[in-house]
Curated annotation (Swiss-Prot):
MF (Gene Ontology): ATP binding; ATP hydrolysis activity; ATP-dependent protein folding chaperone; protein dimerization activity; unfolded protein binding; zinc ion binding
InterPro entries: AAA+_ATPase, ATP-dep_Clp_protease_ClpX, ATPase_AAA_core, Clp_ATPase_C, Clp_protease_ATP-bd_su_ClpX, ClpX_bact, P-loop_NTPase, Znf_CppX_C4
Name by which UniProt lists this protein: ATP-dependent Clp protease ATP-binding subunit ClpX
Pfam families, A to Z: AAA_2, ClpB_D2-small, zf-C4_ClpX
Protein's UniProt keywords contain Nucleotide-binding: yes
Amino acid sequence: MARIGDGGDLLKCSFCGKSQKQVKKLIAGPGVYICDECIDLCNEIIEEELSESSELKWEELPKPREIYEFLDGYVVGQEAAKKTLSVAVYNHYKRVQAGGASGGDAGKGEVELAKSNILLLGPTGCGKTLLAQTLARMLNVPFAIADATALTEAGYVGEDVENILLKLIQAADYDVKKAETGIIYIDEVDKIARKSENPSITRDVSGEGVQQALLKILEGTTASVPPQGGRKHPHQEFIQIDTTNVLFIVGGAFAGLDRIIESRIGKKSLGFRAVLHGKDDPDASNVFGDIMPEDLLKYGMIPEFIGRLPIITSVSNLDREALIRILTEPKNALVRQYKRLFELDGVDLDFTTDALEAIADQAILRGTGARGLRAIMEEVLLSVMYDIPSRKDVARAVITREVVLEHVNPTLVPRDVAASKRGPRQEKSA
């Protein structure tokens, strides 16, 4: 036990040697003591190490081609969107590595690199959210998804825009430095378009008001974020986060924007010679390739908001072939997922080609895109997933077109039949 003095009644810190009279607090442990000054020093060392570990580090920043190839493993089709996103993300994080918007040397004549956020257009269920999620997974950065429809101006019922940043901080385990290099995907942004092209004299708290509130965080600012939500806990301490290096990807279906584009480029949208598009017509989404900022202005987005989204790309409607590829090709394809589920019960699951075609046709018919494929698969496989765990005699289940369309029971192959069929094949191959 560390003691000083003739009487041995004064205790001292086991680390720095100061007596209990020289420090504010001395904390006892099993045979040792530590003072408040040493505790503060330890905290400073830990904080420095944590801040260094939370900095964005890559041995080498992935090149646009590498990013594209990674996206290709998870997202089917949408080549133009993947190419645009690959270049935009590479340039963004190259800028972050170079030192941010000012780079620390802007005053010495260095070129200032501005941030370029991304606007992603296209119908629902075509991969907008998946593209953003896959990018964040590859780069190993914090990722948050926000729904623009829940946002309102400060002071009105709904979520404040600062809650978007809170989700990102939570995704980074409250490591603010790490969150400052994350990606935020704001979905359904078309729902915050103002109600008319012309500015209104009445207050639009969930439309134009939200666009105005988003301007600063999109551009880059130091925002004050309430860690528990600002409205329920008004007296809490705020977290300061700099959004200069946060990449914002803003997405929406923008239903009706195709007609605005067509009227500008000269295609008739009214009358006997009008170009008619159904909800699932591929041309209705392909026309987004001709978009101009003035089209978004007519749709109801304010000029300042459009100006902070300089990169515009779009995803197109998925046809039957693309949906079949989504079912089978990606690393986490639905067919592979369900095959794995059945393997855990010792059963092989097979889909015929016409069954996959029928599932794709159902998704097109429902207008849900790739997002609706899982719901259809659950409906098709419900009865067999109910029976299989209780049956030990089944080796294989075969899903045919009739199972999908007519809801008949799938073909179940018993284990003895499967073994007898497997035997001759093995003898032949041997």
